[in-house]
Amino acid sequence: MASCAEPSEPSAPLPAGVPPLEDFEVLDGVEDAEGEEEEEEEEEEEDDLSELPPLEDMGQPPAEEAEQPGALAREFLAAMEPEPAPAPAPEEWLDILGNGLLRKKTLVPGPPGSSRPVKGQVVTVHLQTSLENGTRVQEEPELVFTLGDCDVIQALDLSVPLMDVGETAMVTADSKYCYGPQGRSPYIPPHAALCLEVTLKTAVDGPDLEMLTGQERVALANRKRECGNAHYQRADFVLAANSYDLAIKAITSSAKVDMTFEEEAQLLQLKVKCLNNLAASQLKLDHYRAALRSCSLVLEHQPDNIKALFRKGKVLAQQGEYSEAIPILRAALKLEPSNKTIHAELSKLVKKHAAQRSTETALYRKMLGNPSRLPAKCPGKGAWSIPWKWLFGATAVALGGVALSVVIAARN
């Protein structure tokens, strides 16, 4: 495995197993120069210096001393002759994001005419992972993932699109583009920058979801769900939500292939799991409306799903809807009376709801200008009772007067 440190001089050793193309070129140049120098010395013994440039014929130095500048010039030119040959793989580091935290260097270029993968294609890579000190911690000969789906660490998702098929590259990545503050136990410690040696083997188009069989859909959705779980464990809730969304898309997309009843039931169970996990990720991100929608979708399929009931109650509580959250948590507790988590959450919400009602009562009293007491049933009833009585009385008197006038007019 190659070292993560950037070579300080052009003559520094290259990674093990990588042909030292640059070193071979330098050695070839030196050998050619030495051979030509020997031939020049033999020719100089036989020549009368008629081959030298006109500058050496000025006559100031002796003839023996004039031979040295010409020989050095020819040696310099001879050493430069091999350089017009096709250049080997570039040694320069490409700063992918412009912040110096994610860099790529080509070790072995892809064959002529090879193409680069695009988002949505399924790629296969050979991956060797090392720490900054050169300690190899992981090797995966056949790592398969969908480009752009966040199935792997961001360092791979961002660097592989810049590689040709058949290319081998070195990628150095800061921990934020790898496994972050959690690391990956037991081999990758927290906040570890990594050095990745990547060989892009193949790149093919992704599957057509409509043409997948039931078992292929289950396998694809399970892979995306597992990727989401890995992101969730690293507290990367944005990527986790993205993976769960992709799993749900694989399950719910239209199908042109018939499925058995067992496969449909299996997909439904998998959809419920993904929706529950998606709601958990959205709750961590404070996306309450989206989390509420995910929980409601679960409850449409399974009205007694305890996880969905509990999370829906938490979402409503976060929105301040205690009067709606408490009945939902009570329903969840009825399904699982021994659940201490639901007990604690319900007790907390009841206290918050009581405090909320007390605050609202004090606010009503302040608005009505009567802080001493508040009518039990309808705040504000006393303030409007007298005016309405006067209004009804005046209306009755007016109607009575009209009726009396009609009667008198009829008699006349």
From Swiss-Prot:
UniProt cofactor(s): Ca(2+)
Domain PPIase FKBP-type: start-end pairs: 120-204
Keywords from the UniProt entry: Apoptosis, Calcium, Host-virus interaction, Isomerase, Isopeptide bond, Membrane, Metal-binding, Mitochondrion, Phosphoprotein, Repeat, Rotamase, TPR repeat, Transmembrane, Transmembrane helix, Ubl conjugation
Cellular compartment(s): Mitochondrion; Mitochondrion membrane
Pfam families, alphabetized: FKBP_C (PF00254), TPR_16 (PF13432)
Record annotation: effect of changing residue 149 to N: Abolishes calcium-binding and reduces affinity for BCL2
Binding site for Ca(2+): 149, 151
Comp. bias (Acidic residues): 22-50
Reactions catalysed: [protein]-peptidylproline (omega=180) = [protein]-peptidylproline (omega=0)
GO MF, one annotated term: identical protein binding
SMART domains listed in its UniProt record: TPR
GO cellular component: cytosol; endomembrane system; endoplasmic reticulum; endoplasmic reticulum membrane; membrane; mitochondrial envelope; mitochondrial membrane; mitochondrion
Record-annotated membrane-spanning stretches: 390-410
Note: Binds the immunosuppressant FK506 only in its calmodulin/calcium activated form.
Renumbered residue ranges of the record's region Disordered: 1-68
Protein name: Peptidyl-prolyl cis-trans isomerase FKBP8
Enzyme Commission no: 5.2.1.8
Tissue-wise expression: Widely expressed. Highest levels seen in the brain. Highly abundant in the retina.
GO biological process, one term: dorsal/ventral neural tube patterning
